[in-house]
Amino acid sequence: MVTETEKEMERRAYARVGLLGNPSDVYGGRAVSFAVASLWATVRLRPSADLLVQPHPRHDLVAFPSLHALVDRLDGGGYYGGVRLLLAICRIFHNHCKDNGIALEDKNFTLSYDTNIPRQAGLSGSSAIVCAALSCLIDFYGVRDKIRVEVRPNLILNAEKELGIVAGLQDRVAQVYGGLVYMDFSQEHMDKLGHGIYTPLDINLLPPLYLIYAENPSDSGKVHSSVRQRWLDGDEFIISSMKEVAQLAYDGHNVLLQKNYTELAKLMNRNFDLRRKMFGDDALGELNIKMVEVARSVGAASKFTGSGGAVVALCPDGDAQAELLKSACQEAGFVVEQIEVAPSALTKEELASLSSHP
């Protein structure tokens, strides 16, 4: 009989939208985020004699028809594909198991990946690849019950940190858990538990939401940099603004439970306005700001899904306003689509295990 660990497997992780609280997750704050069902990364693992990480035929190109084609590819997609992400999570997974006395069977595999998440659009495409790969490794080695759900986002983030990617835990929590999640990253929890407090919520609490994006590659890692230093230096404006952003997620959690979407719209707008004041227009980028302003021109609430490249919008006045939003976005040359939220990614056993830890 062929077991799960002896045959090919495929695992999926979804793009993430930060609804409220970003970027305070990097600063001991809070966040409300969810996974997007239409955008995902898949990783395939099959047993093999040698350990092989396969490059993607499009994202890891090393052969080109011409020098011009090579430059076009680098201008549009940068130098990095997904192979480095797979290598990094393999190393982090191995070392975590070694450090925690988790025995791994001596066997090899071949990893490959695919993704339809727009590159550098603030939708956590990189961490989706890492998350899906971690799921494959956990199941291939049969250690799902030995690596707690709450710890998995840390492993994903550590893999990305190895590659110099600047980010917080929010994205990885949303992708490990799936669905809609409220997160508290207060330093007290991080110091005591080694992770935040993550609360899965019913996805039906969300109103209709819209995703707006442009093909506008922008290195989201750079957006955090100067603000981070000012925060470390004790800049009072940055510290107080980050606290307010975190409070928006706290308030938003309660607003969602009440399905008070008029108030949710106000919180979303305030979130973006605070980000803009902290980071400045040059860091946010003209096209990113335009996406927000186009949505707001029809009265929709809007904010970045992450650090730029895509926007999440809410139409508090309903369907007629949503039609206006679609027209305005299309006229401006932006992609707009209604969001379908991905369901929880956790098993019944994993959901039950969450309640047994504070």
Regions found by a protein language model. Give the residues of each.
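Short, solvent-exposed loop/turn segments at secondary-structure junctions
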Residues: 26-28
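Gly/Ser/Thr-rich loops at beta-strand to alpha-helix junctions
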Residues: 309
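Short pre-catalytic strand/loop immediately N-terminal to key active-site residues, enriched for Gly-Thr
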Residues: 117-121, 299-302
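DPxDG-like acidic metal-binding loop motif
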Residues: 122-145
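Short, conserved phosphate-binding/catalytic loop or strand-edge motifs used
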Residues: 111, 150-156
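Short glycine/proline-rich turn/loop motifs
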Residues: 69-71, 112-116
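C-terminal nucleotide
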Residues: 2-20, 24, 33-37, 41-105, ...
